[in-house]
Swiss-Prot record:
Pfam family, one: Cytochrome_B
Gene Ontology cellular component annotations, sorted alphabetically: mitochondrial inner membrane; respiratory chain complex III
Record GO biological process: mitochondrial electron transport, ubiquinol to cytochrome c
Gene that specifies this protein: mt-cyb
Name of the molecule in the record: Cytochrome b
Similarity field: Belongs to the cytochrome b family.
Length: 381
C-alpha cells in the first residue's frame, strides 16, 4: 500500500489534522465560516501592510506625504492602501459576526478557546488603533492624543504612564515611531495566538447549532467545509473589492485628509466605526476613571460570559426568551455604535447612558436570570 505523505510527514501531518482530515460536525451552518474568513483577512492585512511599510516613512514631517506618495507614485499603491484600510473594516465585521455566533450557539463554553479569542480581539483593537495614527492626519493625531490621555485617569501613575507612552510631553515623533513599530509587530503576535486559538479548538472539536455532542455524526473538513469556506472567500473578496474600488473612503473620516495640526482641534473627535460602541460607553460615564474602566470592561465582559451561563442547554436555538435578549444585545450594540459617532449633546447623552446600562445589564443580570428562569419553565432543574 502506498504511503500517504500528508499523514506521515512531520509538518504536513499537523496541517492534515487541522485542515484536511479534521472531523467536523455535519450540521455546522454558514456562521461557522467566519473563523476561516478571519484567517484570510489576517493574511490580506499582513501582506498589504508589508508592501505599505516598504514605502511608508514613520516621521511626523514625512508620514502624511509618504502616504500621498504611495497613492500617487507607487505602482498600484492606491489599491494596496485602499485594500488595507477597508480590509480592517471587513476584519472587524467578521470578528463581530464570529463573536455573535459564539454567543448565540454557546461556543463560549470552550473556555480556553473563548478567552484566547477575547485576547485576540483586544490585540486586534490595539493594532487597529496604532495603525490609524500612522497616516498622521488630523483624526490620527487627535485620536491618538485623546485615547492615550485616558491613561492619565489611573491614580498616581497616570501622568507618568501617558508620558512614557508618548515618549515626551505630547504626541510627537517618538509616538509615531513606536506606534509604527507596534503596528508592524502586533499582527504577528495575533498570528501566533490564532494558532493557539485553533490548537485549543481542535482539542475539543467544533460546536454545532444544536449545542449537543456531535461525535456520532462527523464528516471530514476537506472537501465538504474547505469548499464551503472557499465560496465564503469569494463572497468576502467581492465585497472587499467593491468597497476598495468603488467606495474606498465610505468608512473613513474626511478629517484625516488634513495633515495633523496640534493647534487646530477637529469639531468632533471620533475613532473608526468599529470602536464607536466602546467609545459611546466611555463617553456615557461622567467620571474619567469610571469611563476608562467601563471601556475596558465592555470588551473583557466577554470573559465572564462562560461563568454566567446558567442554562442547562448550550445553544439558544431552543430558548426563545434568550434568543430575544440576544437580538436586544445586537440592537443595543448598533445603537451604541450610532451614539458614538454623534456629538456630546442631548438627546444623545441620555440615549448613550441608557444603552450603556442596557449593555452591561444584559450580560451580567438579564440573560443569566432569563436562562435560569427557562430551566424552571422547562423543568430542567
Amino acid at each position: 500500500m502506498a504511503i500517504n505523505i500528508r499523514k506521515t510527514h512531520p509538518l504536513l501531518k499537523i496541517m492534515n489534522h487541522a485542515l484536511v482530515d479534521l472531523p467536523a460536525p455535519s450540521n455546522i451552518s454558514l456562521w461557522w465560516n467566519f473563523g476561516s474568513h478571519l484567517g484570510l483577512c489576517l493574511i490580506i492585512q499582513i501582506l498589504t501592510g508589508l508592501f505599505l511599510a516598504m514605502h511608508y516613512t514613520a516621521d511626523i514631517s514625512m508620514a502624511f506625504s509618504s502616504v500621498v506618495h504611495i497613492c500617487r507614485d507607487v505602482n498600484y499603491g492606491w489599491l494596496i492602501r485602499n485594500i488595507h484600510a477597508n480590509g480592517a473594516s471587513l476584519f472587524f465585521i467578521c470578528v463581530y459576526l464570529h463573536i455573535a455566533r459564539g454567543l448565540y450557539y454557546g461556543s463560549y463554553l470552550y473556555k480556553e478557546t473563548w478567552n484566547i479569542g477575547v485576547i485576540l480581539l483586544f490585540l486586534l483593537m490595539a493594532t487597529a488603533f496604532v495603525g490609524y495614527v500612522l497616516p498622521w492626519g488630523q483624526m490620527s493625531f487627535w485620536g491618538a492624543t485623546v485615547i492615550t490621555n485616558l491613561l492619565s485617569a489611573f491614580p498616581y501613575i497616570g501622568d507618568m504612564l501617558v508620558q512614557w507612552i508618548w515618549g515626551g510631553f505630547s504626541v510627537d515623533n517618538a509616538t509615531l515611531t513606536r506606534f509604527f513599530a507596534f503596528h508592524f509587530l502586533l499582527p504577528f503576535l495575533i498570528l501566533a495566538l490564532t494558532v493557539i486559538h485553533l490548537l485549543f479548538l481542535h482539542e475539543t472539536g467544533s460546536n454545532n447549532p444544536l449545542g449537543i455532542n456531535s461525535d456520532a455524526d462527523k464528516i471530514s473538513f476537506h472537501p465538504y467545509f474547505s469548499y464551503k469556506d472557499l465560496l465564503g472567500f469569494f463572497v468576502m473578496i467581492f465585497f472587499l473589492a467593491a468597497l476598495a474600488l468603488f467606495m474606498p473612503n465610505l468608512l473613513g473620516d474626511a478629517e484625516n485628509f488634513i495633515p495633523a495640526n496640534p493647534l487646530v482641534t477637529p469639531p468632533h473627535i471620533k475613532p473608526e466605526w468599529y470602536f464607536l460602541f466602546a467609545y459611546a460607553i466611555l463617553r456615557s460615564i461622567p467620571n474619567k476613571l469610571g469611563g476608562v474602566l467601563a471601556l475596558l470592561f465592555s470588551i473583557f465582559i466577554l470573559m465572564l460570559v462562560p461563568l454566567l451561563h446558567t442554562s442547562k442547554q448550550r445553544s439558544t436555538i431552543f430558548r426563545p426568551m434568550t434568543q430575544i435578549l440576544f437580538w436586544f444585545l445586537v440592537a443595543n450594540s448598533i445603537i451604541l455604535t450610532w451614539i458614538g459617532g454623534q456629538p456630546v449633546e442631548q438627546p444623545f447623552i441620555m440615549v448613550g447612558q441608557i444603552a450603556s446600562i442596557s449593555y452591561f445589564s444584559l450580560f451580567l443580570i438579564i440573560m443569566p436570570f432569563t436562562s435560569w428562569w427557562e430551566n424552571k419553565i422547562l423543568s430542567l432543574n
